[in-house]
Amino acid sequence: MARLQEYYRSTVVQQLMEQFGYKSVMEVPRIRKITLNMGVGEAVADKKIMDNAVGDMQKIAGQKPVVTKARKSIATFKVRDGYPVGCMVTLRRVRMYEFLDRLVNIAIPRIRDFRGISGRSFDGRGNYNMGIKEQIIFPEIEYDKIDALRGMNITITTTAKTDAEAKALLAAFKFPFKN
């Protein structure tokens, strides 16, 4: 069992039950999945760029990403229907908790000029989105071996009904919110 998963079961559940007055343990919000998405628009010109992006994503997530393809042709962007334009990974269970642990304790503190993550990026249904500008904040990526700095979106999907519940859940996991 992952360290954060054990921490959730032993500490976070009790803390949230007291804070929100839940009657059952099953009412307590939990993290359902974490989705990493990397858009690689430059891959239209060179297929090697997509291979490098997939390799970086695989190192970060510990799981093989799915290559996302364009749904329709757009002449302005020189994109045709079916061209690879990005990659994504959905993490669940043990890998999800291990990634969350690395994200909160190692990767986020390595962001340049870091002053805390925004508490406004909730979607109204208890899910949190954040963007990362550089993949080199993760320790798995070696700075010398990358061809370009690429950003990614990280979506944390929870079972929380409201943003306040989701923020309390992520704060219990020691997310460094600004305020």
Swiss-Prot record:
What processes does the entry annotate via GO biological process terms? translation
- Name recorded for this polypeptide: Large ribosomal subunit protein uL5
Species assigned in the record:
Nitrosospira multiformis (strain ATCC 25196 / NCIMB 11849 / C 71)
Chain's role: This is one of the proteins that bind and probably mediate the attachment of the 5S RNA into the large ribosomal subunit, where it forms part of the central protuberance. In the 70S ribosome it contacts protein S13 of the 30S subunit (bridge B1b), connecting the 2 subunits; this bridge is implicated in subunit movement. Contacts the P site tRNA; the 5S rRNA and some of its associated proteins might help stabilize positioning of ribosome-bound tRNAs.
Write out the similarity annotation: Belongs to the universal ribosomal protein uL5 family.
Task: Give the SUPFAM superfamilies listed for this entry.
Answer: RL5-like (SSF55282)
Q: Which domain of life is it from?
A: Bacteria
What quaternary structure, including any partners, is listed in this protein's UniProt entry?
Part of the 50S ribosomal subunit; part of the 5S rRNA/L5/L18/L25 subcomplex. Contacts the 5S rRNA and the P site tRNA. Forms a bridge to the 30S subunit in the 70S ribosome.
Which PROSITE patterns does the entry link to? Answer: RIBOSOMAL_L5
Q: Name one GO cellular component term.
A: ribosome
Q: Which gene encodes it?
A: rplE
**Record-level Gene Ontology MF annotations:** rRNA binding; structural constituent of ribosome; tRNA binding
Q: Which UniProt keywords apply?
A: Ribonucleoprotein, Ribosomal protein, RNA-binding, rRNA-binding, tRNA-binding
Q: Which residues form a coiled coil?
A: none
Q: Does the keyword ATP-binding apply?
A: no
